[in-house]
Amino acid sequence: MSEKTFLVEIGTEELPPKALRSLAESFAANFTAELDNAGLAHGNVEWFAAPRRLALKVANLAESQPDREVEKRGPAIAQAFDAEGKPSKAAEGWARGCGITVDQAERLKTDKGEWLLYRAHVKGESTEALVPNMVATSLAKLPIPKLMRWGASDVHFVRPVHTVTLLLGDKVIPAIILGIQSDRVIRGHRFMGEPEFTIDNADQYPQILLERGKVIADYEARKAKIKADAEEAARKIGGNADLSESLLEEVASLVEWPVVLTAKFEEKFLAVPAEALVYTMKGDQKYFPVYDNAGKLLPNFIFVANIESKDPTQIISGNEKVVRPRLADAEFFFNTDRKKRLEDHLPRLQTVLFQQQLGTLRDKTDRIQALAGWIAGQIGADVNHATRAGLLSKCDLMTNMVFEFTDTQGVMGMHYARHDGEAEDVAVALNEQYQPRFAGDDLPSNPVACALAIADKMDTLAGIFGIGQHPKGDKDPFALRRAALGVLRIIVEKNLNLDLQTLTEEAARLYGDKLTNANVVDDVIDFMLGRFRAWYQDEGYTVDTIQAVLARRPTRPADFDARMKAVSHFRTLEEASALAAANKRVSNILAKATEPLNDIVHASVLKEAAEIELARHLVVLRDKLQPYFADGRYQEALIELAALRAPVDEFFENVMVNAEEKDIRINRLTLLSKLRELFLQVADISLLQ
């Protein structure tokens, strides 16, 4: 069967830059699935994406499906014919569905009986006939939150479509996709290269587009070029470019022919906190800031043009003129804001609603202030500084700078606090109160900042759960999942002595009578333990390990983490699987027991050598392990408990648990309950698979 290269390119107007990669990757995944479902043999499926096109190139695509033999078994002979030998309705219906008569059906005989059988040789359809619908289906399944319509057409897509190229080798596959007749015409760069040209063979893509159209269709190649050229441009001016992955992706999605240029701004603007300048450059203008080797912002920036100019100085000058007013605004806001102390903004917080049932930002500030002080006392931080940080925590939201440049919240609070002469750990806490903002983000760096960050997040969790507005599905308007995980990360990774039970109770108490959910504390803790599950799964722990620890519902995050590590290590021991199975057996036996057990194991009632030996081991281990459990040395405890494998195996091999004599039976059940209690001091290992 011959194979050819297949190409599909959808030429559009400018696609959403932040969605470009996901659109292209989804297109490739969808089309690959269509090929596989259709049984079309193929090689590598390569995707291309630029601001005005999505494309796929499939190597070694078969020109048709393979022929196949089809077998459909019908009713059993006993049900296929009546007593007179006439076909039943079931048989006729089956035959009709196969496109034959009952007389034309074959017979299938096995040792289990005899059935009607339909066999047919089905010729594979051509790729040319199959591909148009497969492309249309793949496009229809793209993750597009909002479709648009253009012209008088009823066609919907993420952006208007102008060209559709479908080539199998050198042949155009005729089709109408998204309202456009397929062709071999491709559009080049808007201002460089050829506006339109024809492609003779699918193998010419993307090289022909590069040479004639001045478009780098390979997304990764375009991104790599921007990164390399920007690094070189920064090196030439003695700096390092801030090439954050998210901005690199966005810029790569905005240009077809990247040209990296360097520009500058007035040094006077460096008196403004760097974060505000960077926010303007990266957020508004999509520029790359440049820092010196000491990490200090330089009065330069790197940007990417979408065209080669004979006079690049004009493009540079134009970008400098665009950014200058924004930097001047930041300078004005900074100077204006410093005329007031942060504390002077407190009254205005009363005018901003946090949540209708939970009050204003001033109300939230008062709660955070009290909770941060309480947390500081629990973890050994400076209570006065934590309380002060709580009082000032939301004041920067009322400043001109943060109102205009919203992403500078927190960091501007730090700068203004320093200007006001606040303690350094208070100032730093104002910046770090929102950390961690995302997975892998830095944690607060000092104890006061930890207290404030936890207080802010716990106040939100207690409040929103307290009025019954739990996250539902993907909807989480108050970012409660992120808040919960942030609290857990801080407590675990900073090894803080905090209990979710008392922490949540204190956070809820500060709301007074505003909360309507009587189960708020349990709901918040359950929610946070659920985030533990997600966190540890991401860390590579198995689900059953997590479930074994969750079964004990430990509410101290640092303690939870210690149990997780202990159980994970326990699983590597030779004795683990046998002891997990034994615990499962013990759990099942105890669940079926209906008689009340003894408080202790009575040695005088023990008869068999195996039960006497097991009881002796349990007494020794119980006394030895109490300090281990008290100190959270769970890994050492489980290593010691692994020694129970032999006596437990002996017990189950030689002892009848449900003896006829009641006192012996109850004593043996009590012995097993004591065994289980020891393991449950760490986790429910009966849940391990």
UniProtKB/Swiss-Prot annotation:
Q: What is its main location?
A: cytoplasm
What are the EC numbers?
Answer: 6.1.1.14
Keyword Ligase in record: yes
Which SUPFAM superfamilies does this UniProt record tie to the protein? Answer: HD-domain/PDEase-like
Record localization: Cytoplasm
Is the keyword Transferase in the record?
no
Example of a GO MF term: glycine-tRNA ligase activity
Biological process GO terms, please? Answer: arginyl-tRNA aminoacylation; glycyl-tRNA aminoacylation
Alphabetic keyword roster: Aminoacyl-tRNA synthetase, ATP-binding, Cytoplasm, Ligase, Nucleotide-binding, Protein biosynthesis
Q: What class does this enzyme belong to in the EC scheme?
A: ligase
**GO cellular-component terms in the record?**
cytosol
Q: Which reactions fall under this protein's catalytic activity?
A: tRNA(Gly) + glycine + ATP = glycyl-tRNA(Gly) + AMP + diphosphate
Q: Which PANTHER family match?
A: GLYCINE--TRNA LIGASE, CHLOROPLASTIC_MITOCHONDRIAL 2 (PTHR30075:SF2), GLYCYL-TRNA SYNTHETASE (PTHR30075)
Indicate the family of this protein: Belongs to the class-II aminoacyl-tRNA synthetase family.
Subunit record text? Tetramer of two alpha and two beta subunits.
Q: What is this protein called?
A: Glycine--tRNA ligase beta subunit
Q: What is the lineage of its organism?
A: Bacteria, Pseudomonadati, Pseudomonadota, Gammaproteobacteria, Enterobacterales
